[in-house]
Amino acid sequence: MSSARRRALGFSFQALLLCAAGWHGAAQADGVSALRDFVQNVQSGRATFNQTVTSPDGAKKKTSTGSFEFLRPNRFRFDYTKPYEQQIVADGVKVWLHDVDLNQVTVRPFDQALGSTPAALLAGASIERDFTLANLPEEAGLQWVQALPKAREGSIRSLRVAFRGKDLAAFEITDAFGQRSRLDFNRFEGNAAVPAARFKFVAPAGADVLQQ
């Protein structure tokens, strides 16, 4: 797998998972309250997304699009459609990263996604235990929340989550190297009837399977 694709999959696996923690809930007085409500009350959901990754100097940007589904506890999938077809599927025990073009699959234990990472929110861990939350000023009609990981050894420098009214609107992560990745969400359905079968992954015939 090329370094560029590995980086794209790595971001998806680690950073996007915060989005799976919750999407749609009752209107809140502030973003922190909305985030807490999402984590506690949203059991499933689906949406489409646009992702933009910006280099530390701001000179280079990469864009991608796809769809997202989750079902608590610990099940989610991301399907990238452009520019490369990729899948990330978690069944509660393992996480499967599938590069369709290369027919290559990387498998990781699910517990590697836990701790002071966005995956902790997906798994239902305590927000205050793993993150320090703070409301940020409103920008362009969006209520922003900052979530700083309490563990300093991870690859995440900071997370920002945005709400528009009662809906999650955007998610932004800055990694340890200063690279910024943002996702904007569309057509979300909260507490949707997502079949459990959507989170069962079988490696395609002939795929190169790498265990990590």
Swiss-Prot record:
SUPFAM superfamilies xref list: Prokaryotic lipoproteins and lipoprotein localization factors
Record-linked InterPro entries: LolA/LolB/LppX, OM_lipoprot_carrier_LolA-like, OM_lipoprot_carrier_LolA_Pbac
Coiled-coil intervals: none
CDD domains: LolA (cd16325)
Subcellular location(s) per record: Periplasm
Function: Participates in the translocation of lipoproteins from the inner membrane to the outer membrane. Only forms a complex with a lipoprotein if the residue after the N-terminal Cys is not an aspartate (The Asp acts as a targeting signal to indicate that the lipoprotein should stay in the inner membrane).
Residues annotated as transmembrane: none
Protein name: Outer-membrane lipoprotein carrier protein
Similarity-based family: Belongs to the LolA family.
Pfam family, one: LolA
GO terms (BP aspect): lipoprotein localization to outer membrane; lipoprotein transport
Major place of residence: periplasm
Protein species of origin: Leptothrix cholodnii (strain ATCC 51168 / LMG 8142 / SP-6)
Span of the signal peptide: 1-29
Taxonomic lineage: Bacteria, Pseudomonadati, Pseudomonadota, Betaproteobacteria, Burkholderiales
GO cellular component: periplasmic space
Subunit structure: Monomer.
Alphabetized UniProt keyword annotations: Chaperone, Periplasm, Protein transport, Signal, Transport
